[in-house]
Regions:
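Generic low-polarity alpha-helical segments
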Residues: 1, 13, 107, 118, ...
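LRR N-terminal entry segment and analogous cap-like coil->beta motifs
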Residues: 1-48
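Short, solvent-exposed loop/turn at the beta-strand->alpha-helix junction
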Residues: 4-11, 30-38, 56-64, 82-87, ...
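A structural signal for leucine-rich repeat
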Residues: 15, 37-43, 61-69, 87-96, ...
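Inter-repeat linker/turn residues at the boundaries of leucine-rich repeats
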Residues: 19, 30, 42-45, 56, ...
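Conserved hydrophobic beta-strand positions in leucine-rich repeat
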Residues: 22-27, 50-52, 76-78, 102-104, ...
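Intrinsically disordered low-complexity regions specifically enriched for long asparagine
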Residues: 53, 180, 234, 250, ...
Length: 280
């Protein structure tokens, strides 16, 4: 008979003194339930970080208990907790004001309501991963822009309901932003990218893979405003030409990585402009 390793490990934890435990990692422990999460909360009053990614049995009940009982929580990974909804996320927003990092990758039942609760209650957030949260739209992202001025990294890969309004709010409110992934945000245009160029001068990496509506206008805004840029992915941005690439070459002297697969309008002239960066 196959041994239930996830259950054994948690039982071992709960049989010893865990009053000083600050970090617990349970990634992929598929038999972890809400009751187990509640037991951990009761026995680990100093908990600062918990990883429950791929714990498919964990629901809003367990996450809400974390919100109510772990006011010092700073980091939580709930990626691919497929039963999680806005109710659990709202509880974190209400109770975890010190939260700095949250990963909700693949939590596709979470909507703007949950993300708005984080924006309202978690002003210390530095890192947010909403990759493939395809029900999150501009309202949720705008709430993060308004409430999370310390945000440094946000992943919106595959959030195809996010467009210029949400991204522009990040540009206005998140001046410390260093990394943003907007890959396959199909509705994004130059307006959102221009806002990032104007407001996010510390930006180091941006991923625009598949953002086919972005043109030289948006890319040139990044070149003008993001002098610390080190990595940019423009794969599939078929409207970008030499003009945009040349603007990056002129303004982004720290650029190390650029991806142009599918940029069929870029010619030798644009590549030559990038080549001049490498000679500095």
């Amino acid at each position: 008979m196959k041994r239930d390793t996830s259950r054994v490990r948690v039982c071992d934890i709960l049989q010893v003194d865990t009053s000083d435990v600050v970090t617990i990692g349970l990634r992929g422990c598929s038999n972890i339930t809400d009751q187990c999460v509640m037991d951990i909360i009761n026995r680990c009053p100093k908990l600062r970080s918990i990883n429950l990614s791929y714990c498919g049995k964990v629901t809003d009940a367990g996450v809400s208990a974390l919100g109510a009982g772990c006011g010092q929580l700073q980091s939580i990974d709930l990626s691919f907790c497929s039963k999680l909804t806005d109710a659990g996320i709202a509880a974190l927003g209400a109770g975890c004001g010190q939260l700095q990092s949250i990963d909700l990758h693949g939590c596709n039942m979470v909507t703007d309501a949950g993300i708005s609760a984080l924006g309202a209650g978690c002003g210390q957030l530095h890192s947010v991963n909403l990759s493939e949260c395809n029900k999150v739209a501009n309202a949720g992202i705008s709430a993060l822009g308004a409430g999370c001025g310390q945000l440094q990294s946000i992943d919106l890969h595959g959030c195809n309901m996010v467009a210029d309004a949400g991204v522009s709010a990040l540009g206005v409110g998140c001046g410390q932003l260093q990394s943003i992934d907007l890959s396959f945000c199909y509705n994004l245009t130059d307006a959102g990218i221009t806002a990032l160029g104007a407001g996010c001068g510390q930006l180091q990496s941006i991923y625009l893979h598949g953002c086919s509506r972005v043109t030289d206008v948006g890319v040139s805004a990044l070149g003008a405003g993001c002098g610390q840029l080190q990595s940019i992915d423009l794969c599939g941005c078929s409207r970008v030409t030499d003009a945009g690439i040349s603007a990056l070459g002129a303004g982004c002297g720290q650029l190390q990585d650029i991806y142009l697969y599918g940029c069929n309008m870029v010619t030798d002239a644009g590549v030559s402009a990038l080549g001049r960066i490498c000679l500095r």
